UniProtKB/Swiss-Prot annotation:
Function (record text): Catalyzes the formation of phosphatidylethanolamine (PtdEtn) from phosphatidylserine (PtdSer).
An example molecular function term from Gene Ontology annotations: phosphatidylserine decarboxylase activity
Cofactor note: Binds 1 pyruvoyl group covalently per subunit.
Superkingdom: Bacteria
Protein name: Phosphatidylserine decarboxylase proenzyme
Pathway given in the UniProt record: Phospholipid metabolism; phosphatidylethanolamine biosynthesis; phosphatidylethanolamine from CDP-diacylglycerol: step 2/2
Catalytic function, reaction form: a 1,2-diacyl-sn-glycero-3-phospho-L-serine + H(+) = a 1,2-diacyl-sn-glycero-3-phosphoethanolamine + CO2
InterPro entries with a match to the protein in the record: PS_Dcarbxylase, PSD-B, PSD_type1_pro
The organism of origin for this protein: Xanthomonas campestris pv. campestris (strain B100)
Keywords annotated in UniProt: Cell membrane, Decarboxylase, Lipid biosynthesis, Lipid metabolism, Lyase, Membrane, Phospholipid biosynthesis, Phospholipid metabolism, Pyruvate, Zymogen
């Protein structure tokens, strides 16, 4: 375990993330430009695909970080039966949900019920599929729909804010089931689908297209929002949310719906819109 990961056990997660949020939204020219220049240089951010490629134009660091891409920079897989990768990033893990458990790293796993904050909500995903995608600071930070769906419910699960970098994934037990997260439940033509937005150290917020800022809340209770009857339907490939810094999204699918795309594995670099899985059509 690295020193940084070890320190995250004792660091004041909330305080650091609150400070990061204040800096991310600062409109002080020197502050926001220093942040933009530092992150661009350190992580090799490529602005050539951004709708606004001039880093000086962004009013805040957060505006830069959640930047839109040029039209056509990402396109959905041409196969209409392909479920799509929800974001740019790197596969942390993917595979079957075996006996209700989701694989994190060698010797590490957690239950779907722990992740979703609800035993009953996890039942439809037993023996289904999961994919965990890590968004690094250089990546496009908007999350899109793998498949068309109607929003049924969101569940804000309070928790810690450990780093979600590779070393933490290998060494922090049940990492994604311990960090603060927003669970988004959708109804689709094949049944339920869940997209879980996992917060992390220095992540200053998660926003959804239907409700704006969802995290931070910094509460200590699970909070549910019922969207049944609201008619919030998002099409395949549509934007659904964004991270106001880097983090992780986990997609859960029920059994018998799709087969994972061949060639995908842990550590694979992926792009929004490429095939994650393909429908199993009788």
């Amino acid at each position: 375990m690295s020193l940084v990961t070890s320190l995250t056990y004792v660091l004041p997660h909330r305080l650091l993330s609150s400070l990061a949020r204040a800096l991310a939204y600062s409109k002080t020219p020197a502050t926001k430009q220093w942040l933009i220049d530092t992150v661009t240089r350190k992580f090799g951010v490529d602005l050539s695909e951004a709708q606004e490629p001039d880093p000086r134009v962004y009013p805040t660091f957060n505006a830069f970080f959640t930047r839109a891409l040029k039209p056509g920079a990402r396109v959905p897989d041409a196969d209409p039966q392909a479920l799509l990768m929800p974001a740019d990033g790197r596969i942390s893990q993917l595979g079957p949900i075996e006996n209700g458990r989701i694989f994190q790293a060698k010797g590490q796993s957690f239950t779907a019920a722990e992740l979703l904050g609800d035993e009953s909500a996890a039942v439809p995903f037993h023996n289904g599929l999961f994919a965990t995608v890590y968004l690094s600071p250089k990546d496009y930070h908007r999350v899109h729909m793998p498949w068309s769906g109607t929003l049924r419910e969101t569940v804000h699960v309070p928790g810690r804010l450990f780093s979600v970098g590779p070393d933490a994934v290998r060494n922090v037990p049940r990492l994604f089931a311990r960090n603060e997260r927003l669970v988004c439940h959708f109804d689709t033509d094949f049944g339920p689908m869940a997209s879980v937005m996992v917060g992390a150290l220095l992540v200053s917020g998660v926003e959804t297209v239907w409700s704006g800022v969802e995290i931070p809340r910094y509460g200590d209770r699970i909070t549910r929002k019922d969207y049944r009857g609201k008619g919030i339907t998002l099409e395949r490939f549509a934007e659904m949310a964004r991270f106001n810094y880097g983090s992780t999204v986990i997609v859960l699918l029920p059994p018998g719906v799709a087969a994972l795309e061949g060639g995908l594995a842990a550590e694979s670099s992926v792009r929004l819109g490429q095939a994650l899985a393909r429908r199993q059509v009788a």
